[in-house]
Every structure is written in structure tokens, then in C-alpha cells.
Amino acid sequence: MGYRFQPSSRHFVGTVEQKHRELLHNQIQNVYHLFDVSVSRMITRRWTVNASLPVFLAYRNQLYVPRGEFRVRSIGDVTVGGRAWIFRPPTESGANIGLGLNLKLPTGKYNALGVATDRNGNVIVATADQSIQAGDGGTGFSVDVQAYRPFYGRTMLYFSGTYLFNPRNTNGVSTFRTRRGEQVMSVADQYLARGGVSRALPKFRHITVTFGGRIEGVPVRDLIGRSDGFRRPGYAISLDPGFMVAYKGSVFSCNVPFAVERNRRRSVTDIANGTHGDAAFADYALILGFSRSF
């Protein structure tokens, strides 16, 4: 199981921070809590099947019309799939590469609503912003890779990467936006890659420290299908320190990636309209994990 906490309030256009938003007290604040319950079963030493159920809680204070505080509580998009190691573990070199394929089902709420006020101060029911929806409304699939190899002594090199393909173009959910092409939400691809080094502490044999980097984001254009509708493409590059504690079949992990570069790229609709929208990015995230082998 896993948990991710992430607050975001610093706005960027491209890589330029919009510092005036904070000075004018009109920056948008998003707060995310993501719980993930997963189960996996080893079929053979090389093959594993898995399933994951995320639970999503989010808050957003929206300071423009429709103005209000939005809260979303929902399960997220369920994934089921499998993974195979290229070499049968354990390998003589201590290194291996794993490939995974997962199906993403549109089980998360992607049309959550909230109470807000319009330009005239009237109380209305409005669609929550795309950034705090628990799902995207699309059936997709992801491919992932994991790799590790011994480097020196107790030091290990590691890498993992995931790309989520979302072939659906838009999900039909109306936004509050009037700019051409942004009236409905886009169903966007997503990606994540991280890598670094880990080292077991000699005096604390159950503890391993890790340090690396990660990049995660949303592309301007999907690899499969069209990329119409409203989306906020871009990426964040972070340094990613952490540690793991392993004891008698249980593993606890903690990572606190903190951003060193944020880039809100121009979307397809931005390019068509000659504009460049902004996006709020997080300074850091707290990522916890716990697993138990039976």
C-alpha cells in the first residue's frame, strides 16, 4: 500500500514562476491525498500479476469564477496487469530488468461537482477543476520498466519508468472555460521516470538509503489518438532522497522528492489560440509505502 501527500500553489508559465500571484494573494491552492492499495501474486520466479485500487482525496480553493472551495473524495482508476523479469531471479550478476503491462479502467470519478458562485454572486453547482478529479474517464494502458544492478560494494543502481497511454480524446465533461477548444476536458497521457543509487547501511543492516532524480508530467500531445480539449501539459524534475526499512518480509519506504525545475508547456489549444496557460506546481511531495510478503 502507498500514500502520497502533495500541496501545490506556485504558478508557472513555461519555466517562469508567476510570483505576482502570491503577492496579489490570488494563487490557487491544491492539496492531494492519494492512498493506494495493491496486491500482487508471484506466478513463477519471473512472472507476477497485480492489481491496484487508489483512493483519492483533494481540495482546491478556486479564486476565479466559478469561485469556491472544491473537495473531491472518490476511488481512482483501477489498474490490473502483470510483470515479467527478463532474467530468471536470482541472477548471477545480481542485476535484472523487469517489463510490465497494465490495463487502466475508468473507475474514478471524473465529473465531480462542487458548490461555487458565478460572476453575479449567485450560488451554483459547478464542475471541479480537472486537476482534482479522481479519474480521467478513459480506458488506457501503461507500460513500465524496472531495472537494477550492483555498482560498488553495498551500492545499487536503480531505474523505473512508466508511460500511461490514454487513447480517448476528451471525456465530455464541461469545463468553466470559454476559450476556443477548452470547453471539455482532455484525456491525457502521463509519464514518470526515476533513477538513482541506493546503499545499504553497514551498521544498520535493515536500512537502505536512496538518492536520485525523477521527472513526471503530462505531454502536449498523446502518442495514440487526438489531444483536443483542455489540459495542462508540462513536467516537474525533482531530486528524490529517501530510505527503506526491510524486516522479516515487511518493507517500509519513504521518499520526499522536491522540485528543481517546473515547466508548464503550451497545450494544443494554447498553440491554436496564441496563448500560454499557467499551472500550479508542488514544491515537494511526501511518498510513503509499505509492503508485506506472505
Residue ranges of each PLM-predicted region?
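Surface-exposed strand-loop-strand hairpins of Gram-negative outer-membrane beta-barrel proteins
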Residues: 5-34, 131
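Outer membrane beta-barrel transmembrane domains
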Residues: 12-22, 168-294
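Long, hydrophobic/aromatic-enriched structural stretches that serve as scaffold segments
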Residues: 23-85
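Transmembrane beta-strands of outer-membrane beta-barrel pores
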Residues: 3-9, 55-59, 86, 103-109, ...
